[in-house]
Amino acid sequence: LEESPCPAVSDGLRRRMGEAAIKAAQAAGYTNAGTVEFLLDQKGRFYFIEMNARVQVEHPVTEMLTGIDIVREQIRIAAGEKLRHEQGRIWFHGHAIECRILAADGERGFRPSPGTITRWEVPSGPGVRIDTGVTAGSVVSSYYDPMIAKVICWDQTRDSCIERMEATLRGMRIE
């Protein structure tokens, strides 16, 4: 489960963390998509953990909040084009949550559950994004990551986003 913005982080703290992330990237001469991770202690102090110089699996949450297609932008940059977005003009709008859907058996320690998908019904609609590469008839192997989809929901508020995610997950039928 991924969620943004984090309800435990104030706007001021989020701004300071963002400024620290930008300074870290600039100090390293980094000019592409990346993720800076921090650890937050109980007193609200944050500490640098790592910077991931890649598009992470959770990137759709950021895309839903900003309206920016991060993968498209990274391809453009790799092709020699200039970045179209200034950091100071990127704003979060609303709230986003991502759930990973696994072909795994929760009653058996989340062991992979390989086989053929015989039923694939996934709701769609405004504020709902499904990232997947499977459909009914797809074979799920035990030799690969059991993640078969990501469900990402967006809405104006955290409560309404949670409601949208719950409705979407309740409407899914995968066998």
Where are the regions a protein language model picked out?
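ATP-dependent carboxylate activation and anion-phosphoryl transfer catalytic cores
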Residues: 1-175
